Amino acid sequence: MSVRILNWSNRRALAPIAVAIRSFKEQHPGADVAQVERPLSDFEHQGIEGVAAQYDIVIFDHPFCGRIAASGCFEPLETSLPDLLGDDRAALYIGPSLATYRYRTHVWGAPIDGATQNAAYRPDLLERVGGKVPRSHGDVLELGRRARHAGMWLGTALQTPHAFMSILSYMANMGQPVRADDDALLEIPRASFARAYQAMHDVMQLSPPEARGWNSIDLHEQMIARDDIVYTPAVYGYATYGEEDMRHRLGFAPFAGLEAPYHAGSTIGGTALGLSASASDRDMALAFIRHALQLGIVERRIGRHHGQAAARAEWDDQEIDRIFNGFQSGSYSSMETAWTRPRYPGYPEFQRKAGEAMASCLLAGADVAKAHGMLCDIAGLGVRAGAAR
């Protein structure tokens, strides 16, 4: 029997699992465990039922929990790993990392990676323009004007679904997020959407034209490769871009929202290990999931191998924070106050279409009414249903 793990292609994801596989094999001689990688774009829009039929363990993010529960393609984990994933185990993980995978009373994923939208910047360029790390959106615009005066830019990621993710973060920061239950999206508040859409437009206008094709990895890559992107206020953070082997080590800070507390409300990401209901060797797969979780919670080794664990123990580890140039300390407050996306079965498809629509609207200069109407149509809501109540 063998265990095949589906992962996504960045060293943040691959390196910690490779270490976990090696140490697992040392403890279980003869175990056949391997990982397969695929691009980030496939990860963000995966057909979860199909990959669950092909792999024993699938690394995924929480918006798929509704589809997973409805299809039965994964096995719930809370009864098999109660000491790591039980109702009283949330404090083992940063922010709502564990809660995001609890849907309809079951835990569908074991949190292995912790992330939310946070700010990132080039310390050398920030000093060059004479700016400070922004705390609020108003500060972001002031820094953006300084950057443009110096021939530099802010940065943003517009490729699906990242523009929409930033809009969701700004809305949640104002205390008026999109509203959903376990079955459907219920409301897209017009007032908070209008301000969030404008905030995203503001940042886009201060970003280079090429940003229209960037996802979160692209934005980090561009920030270390070129010398004219000073800062981004909202991107899914990659701690590895603060490591010493980068051409320019990035610095990290909390999400810069519209209202105080400015760091709060960013849209949580991260990933978890899901156990396929059709795993070829269930016991070995479950044993590997336990082993991988303990690598972060007990041994604190994920951050020492390019990863950013969901385990709180690693976020509190000063040496890991040093390795990543302050990533954990810089984004800690945003992780602790992050907002969780809806998880009803149809949400992943809504997110995909909404991401395409918001990127298109922003690039075309569409007004708030048109953009809001498009979102409500995609969600199957009338515009009145999407209005603030």
Where are these regions (language model features)?
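Extracytoplasmic/periplasmic solute-binding protein
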Residues: 108-110, 141-185, 229
